[in-house]
């Protein structure tokens, strides 16, 4: 029993890992966000055909972030990345009022997938530095986020080029994974302390 409790505590305090899928319409800023988080700088990007994957270390959590291209022709491929996804980052170009309904349709289509039923949702309302950008409350309304009653979600205003808001979003994700692990480990600890006869 002592060895089992020792293993439990090492799991509680070990570095945690989280698989993140980052999607959104094309030109929303996904790749810029990924490399701002990874390198701390802006990199020149081209439209992503396929995916980029990087590991971002933050607050004792190793986030494996899959940035998948957003052009309409390759969106059907998004579903191939759903398996084992714990967190979904949906990036919205807050300045693109013409396509916010399209963004909503794509988001709702994804969230209906069984493989993503347990994934937490972080929405990055990106490009907040632009003068015509919709604020987080307006994006929340346009995407219909309040209708998501069975899912943990959060929206964060961001500016990928300056990095503003990105780490606040990662804070929310890290708290979500900590809470999930704590609930799971708490259940295991109760079972160890009070096993059924």
UniProtKB/Swiss-Prot annotation:
One matching Pfam family is Arf
UniProt-listed GO biological process terms: intracellular protein transport; vesicle-mediated transport
Where in the cell is the protein located?
A: Golgi apparatus
Output the Gene Ontology terms for molecular function: GTP binding; GTPase activity
Indicate yes or no for the key word Nucleotide-binding.
yes
GO CC annotations on file: cytoplasm; Golgi apparatus
Q: Indicate the enzyme's highest-level EC class.
A: hydrolase
Describe the reaction catalysed, as an equation. Answer: GTP + H2O = GDP + phosphate + H(+)
Return the CDD domains for the record: Arf1_5_like
**Annotated GTP binding sites:** 24-31, 67-71, 126-129
Positions of N-myristoyl glycine lipidation = 2
KW Protein transport (keyword) present: yes
Per UniProt, the keywords (alphabetical) are: ER-Golgi transport, Golgi apparatus, GTP-binding, Hydrolase, Lipoprotein, Myristate, Nucleotide-binding, Protein transport, Transport
Catalytic activity, EC:
3.6.5.2
Q: Which InterPro entries match?
A: Arf1-5-like (IPR045872), P-loop_NTPase (IPR027417), Small_GTP-bd (IPR005225), Small_GTPase_ARF (IPR024156), Small_GTPase_ARF/SAR (IPR006689)
Q: Which PROSITE patterns did the record assign? A: ARF
* Role noted for this protein: GTP-binding protein involved in protein trafficking; may modulate vesicle budding and uncoating within the Golgi apparatus.
Which family is this sequence assigned to? Belongs to the small GTPase superfamily. Arf family.
Please state what the protein is called. ADP-ribosylation factor 1
Species name: Solanum tuberosum (Potato)
